[in-house]
Each structure stands twice: as structure tokens, then as C-alpha cells.
Amino acid sequence: STLTGHLIYKCGGIDQRTIDEYEKRATEMGKGSFKYAWVLDQLKDERERGITINIALWKFETKKYIVTIIDAPGHRDFIKNMITGTSQADVAILVVAAGQGEFEAGISKDGQTREHATLANTLGIKTMIICVNKMDDGQVKYSKERYDEIKGEMMKQLKNIGWKKAEEFDYIPTSGWTGDNIMEKSDKMPWYEGPCLIDAIDGLKAPKRPTDKPLRLPIQDVYKISGVGTVPAGRVETGELAPGMKVVFAPTSQVSEVKSVEMHHEELKKAGPGDNVGFNVRGLAVKDLKKGYVVGDVTNDPPVGCKSFTAQVIVMNHPKKIQPGYTPVIDCHTAHIACQFQLFLQKLDKRTLKPEMENPPDAGRGDCIIVKMVPQKPLCCETFNDYAPLGPFAVR
């Protein structure tokens, strides 16, 4: 959060007076070093614990892009929120701490860094920037050796997880606190020849937007705004959303008309893929809508709930073998729903994805299986081929 907050501040997303106010209040609480993090950690509870719980959305502009930052939690208790944030992103910035012991803990068997990188890959993110952060740490002292060690280890770990292009990613030595290598190259690390963070962001290619497909918008939150009414919010994944449209909220059959669409407090004539929007609907109360519902156009391939679906599942890490009947919570787009693994149909070779065994009795770490899955509550998901953002899911 400190790195992200500093980036937003430097790009003019927040003024100096607010930063000064945050610094004063953070110092009073004995947390002066958290002032930039406070840009994002708006919740009082988060400030007092010094960790990120919710997903903060913030907008800033670079020379090339308007960027929406989704600051997702890195703390284990809040992994569900982290998954929701990741499922809305085009690219990821993975922040690893350079401090002795801190980096090693993150990439250990159950470490956060490894888990986040795995989830980002599973949820369909293709491109990543890695910030080797806290280079100003008293033990690290902007050391090239420490940076090289972390870069080498991260490349190896990312490849093992399934990031085939890990060698092409930018690995940037940064300090969220001092601002080194955020907006411009740092004179404290003359040995580093790559881009600073803002240039790396501008060097990313914007993904192709599926505007030609029917509308799909998974709901992230639902608000009641006085004088306006019920406002669901989320990211348009495919298609377009515009005032006057009749939309359905799957897996229910509730239909409503869109009155207005807003992004970052500006009204839009229409929103397309990648836009994080809030929209006002007629005739529905906040209690009628839930996070995880999917919005679609009533007249154009509207989304529906599914009673069961067939999925390819890779067991990344599980203490013991799983068998049919196993019922974990799955995170699919913004939905979090218990889902039973009813039948194991096939076991596949992980490299070729060719069937190795029909109806395997169980599956363990490293296995790739085809499973018939039954949601325990209504769920709207789609095949990866038809609507790629609504196909991937993570099992926890």
C-alpha cells in the first residue's frame, strides 16, 4: 500500500495537503512510516492494524494510460478480497519485500508471494511487473547482490507456477517509502538499467477488449446512495453497459432498467470492458442483489445460473488427497460459493493434457483432473471459450 500510495500521490491522484494530514495523524498513532499507505487504507480498522483489508480503487493518469489501481490485500486473513481484486485486473504488480527473511517467508511453501502469484496466473492475468521493494531497508542498503538474488529466485518460482514469460517481466528495485525508481530512475541504484515503475506501466500493452460479445458484469458491491437509490458496482468484463438497457441479474431472474452509469464520479453514455463502474437500477433494493451476481443484457444471450459444470482442476497444494464429495469454497469472478466435487471424470497428463486415467478415485498435489462440480447455492459461471473472464476459478 505504501508503494501504491506513493505512486498515486506522485501522479497527482492526491494532493500534498492530504498527504501532510495523513502523516500528522499516522505519527500521532506511532505509525509515521505508513502515510502513503493511508491513501488507500481508508478504513479505520486497517489503519490501526497497518494492513490492507478492502480493495481500494484509485485512478491516476500516466503519459499513455488512465490507470485504475486495485490495491489488493497481501495479508493471509483477507485472501478472499485479494481474489476478488485480482479477478478484475488486466495486469498485476507483485510487490516483494527485499528485507532479509521477509522475502524468504513470502516464497516459502505456504508463503503469500507464492499464493498470490499462483492465483493471479489461475485467474487469467497474463502480464506482471515485479517490484523488489524496501531496497532502502537498513540491511539491504540498495544492494545489487540482494536484488539479483531475489530476481533470480522470483523468475524460477514464477516459471514453476506456470508464468511461461517470467523472463520477459520487469523486475524493478524500488522503495515505496523514499520513492526510489517509482517516477524516475534512482541515483542510489546506478547498477539498475531497466525502467522505473511508471515507465514500466506505460510499456505494458493494453489487452484486446471483447466489446463485440454480449454484456457480462460480475457484481463486486451493492450500495444504497441517498437521492439516487440502489447502485451495484463492478467491472464490465465483456460487452457494453448503457443507460436505458434492460438487464438481468443472474443466477436470479430479476430484471431492471439501467438509469445511469458512472465511473470515478463521472457519468458515462456507455461503459465497456475494463471499466470499473457503478450503475443505478430501477425497482430493486440493495437486499435483492448480491456480490457475485452477473449482470447481462436481457435481449442478447442473457446469463443464467448453472446447476452443475465440468471443470479442469489442478491441485496446487492440499495436505491430503481429495475424493469425490469434497466440498470447498470456490472463488469464481466475484462469487464465493461452496461447490461439491461430485465426480472425478478423468486424470490428465499435466504437460500434454491428454487423459491418463478414467474416473480416478482421488487426486493429490500436482494432479490435473476433470471434475463434475455442483454449486451448493445458485451460481453464474461461463465456459472459458465463451466468456474467458467468467471461466477461471480458485479453490480454497
From Swiss-Prot:
Residues 1-211 form the tr-type G domain. It is found in: Cytoplasm. InterPro entries: EFTu-like_2 (IPR004161), G_TR_CS (IPR031157), GTP-eEF1A_C (IPR054696), P-loop_NTPase (IPR027417), T_Tr_GTP-bd_dom (IPR000795), TRAFAC_GTPase_members (IPR050100), Transl_B-barrel_sf (IPR009000), Transl_elong_EF1A/Init_IF2_C (IPR009001). One of its GO terms (molecular function) is translation elongation factor activity. The keyword Signal does not apply. Keywords: Cytoplasm, Elongation factor, GTP-binding, Nucleotide-binding, Protein biosynthesis. CDD domains: EF1_alpha, EF1_alpha_II, EF1_alpha_III. GO terms for cellular component: cytoplasm. It comes from the Eukaryota. PROSITE patterns: G_TR_1, G_TR_2. GTP binds at residues 71-75, 133-136. Pfam families: GTP-eEF1A_C, GTP_EFTU, GTP_EFTU_D2. This protein promotes the GTP-dependent binding of aminoacyl-tRNA to the A-site of ribosomes during protein biosynthesis. NCBIfam families: EF-1_alpha, PRK12317.1. Belongs to the TRAFAC class translation factor GTPase superfamily. Classic translation factor GTPase family. EF-Tu/EF-1A subfamily. This is Elongation factor 1-alpha. The lineage of its organism: Eukaryota, Metamonada, Diplomonadida, Hexamitidae, Giardiinae.
